[in-house]
Amino acid sequence: MTALNHWQPSADIKNLLKRAKIIAEIRQFFTERGLLEVETPVLSEFGVTDLHLSTFSTEFLAPFGEQSKTLWLSTSPEYHMKRLLAAGSGPIFQISKVFRNEEAGNRHNPEFTMLEWYRPHFHMHRLINEVDDLLQQILDCPPAESLSYQFVFQEYVGLDPLSAERSELIEAARKHNFMAEDNEDRDTLLQFLFSEVVEPQIGKERPIAVYHFPSTQAALAQVSPEDQRVAERFEFYYKGLELANGFHELADAQEQRHRFELDNQQRQKCELPTREIDERFLAALEAGMPDASGVALGIDRLMMIALDCEKINDVISFAVDNA
């Protein structure tokens, strides 16, 4: 198909009209609750160290060369929004374009829309309740179920993810056609079993919030003070889709630096380029970010459920194949 006859939008106009109404409703939800809508940069001097995120970059060509540098397209507005929290913004939300240099398919587009919000002085379960409120309002769905990662893993895999031997995880992964090596990384095994065995079984009739992921998968979340084996992190699933990922946010700059350094060590082991650590973000944590919980929710996947669409292309104006 040539560019000349491939000009039509990916989604029907009727779906785009419904999408606009839903986004307006989301904005109203947050403004009525006293959150400030913010805008942060799409381009940044720093990428992300996360091993599992592939980023887009571009070159800033300043007129005289001194300011020329590589800039990274945002995979999430998280670091900038936390800098705003540290500056005293109070509770904030943002609906923004984000970019991940990964697959394009029924559930993925390299450019997509993210809803992200942060609540100072909210604990993890209070934010889970607010995500649930939003989903009920937008999707007219039943209240969410809330279960621990340990519980759902044991329920569907038959192993305790926090205490199982690595050999047991390898055996379970091989039963599900994952060609696990004898020295396979424990987190790789857990992530495979969760995504391939657990996720297809949960959130079918109503949303489910899975909380207390293993502390080795904490990312930017705090480790639970009650159980050091788990992180204060949660994810929402509904109708076969991962919708949201939230944290009781880590505010310790030293610990966050340590995690970034571990990310880069893992990148080296996997023969991936290391990423420069975002010193501005760490400086904001050092200055004092308030205790807060935050969550990122995929708007396009939310639209897929709201509009009863099986493909992400049906809810965005122009997918990557005809952008």
UniProtKB/Swiss-Prot annotation:
InterPro entries for this protein: Aa-tRNA-synt_II, aa-tRNA-synth_II, aa-tRNA-synth_II/BPL/LPL, EpmA, Lys-tRNA-synth_II_C
Binding site for ATP: 100-102, 109, 242-243, 298
Position of the signal peptide: none
GO function term, MF aspect, one: lysine-tRNA ligase activity
E.C. code: 6.3.2.-
Binding-site positions, substrate: 76-78, 118, 249
GO biological process: lysyl-tRNA aminoacylation
Keywords: ATP-binding, Ligase, Nucleotide-binding
GO CC aspect terms: cytosol
EC class of the enzyme, as a word: ligase
Catalysed conversion reaction: D-beta-lysine + L-lysyl-[protein] + ATP = N(6)-((3R)-3,6-diaminohexanoyl)-L-lysyl-[protein] + AMP + diphosphate + H(+)
Transmembrane feature ranges: none
Subunit structure: Homodimer.
Its biological purpose: With EpmB is involved in the beta-lysylation step of the post-translational modification of translation elongation factor P (EF-P). Catalyzes the ATP-dependent activation of (R)-beta-lysine produced by EpmB, forming a lysyl-adenylate, from which the beta-lysyl moiety is then transferred to the epsilon-amino group of a conserved specific lysine residue in EF-P.
Family that this chain belongs to: Belongs to the class-II aminoacyl-tRNA synthetase family. EpmA subfamily.
Protein name: Elongation factor P--(R)-beta-lysine ligase
Native source species: Haemophilus influenzae (strain PittGG)
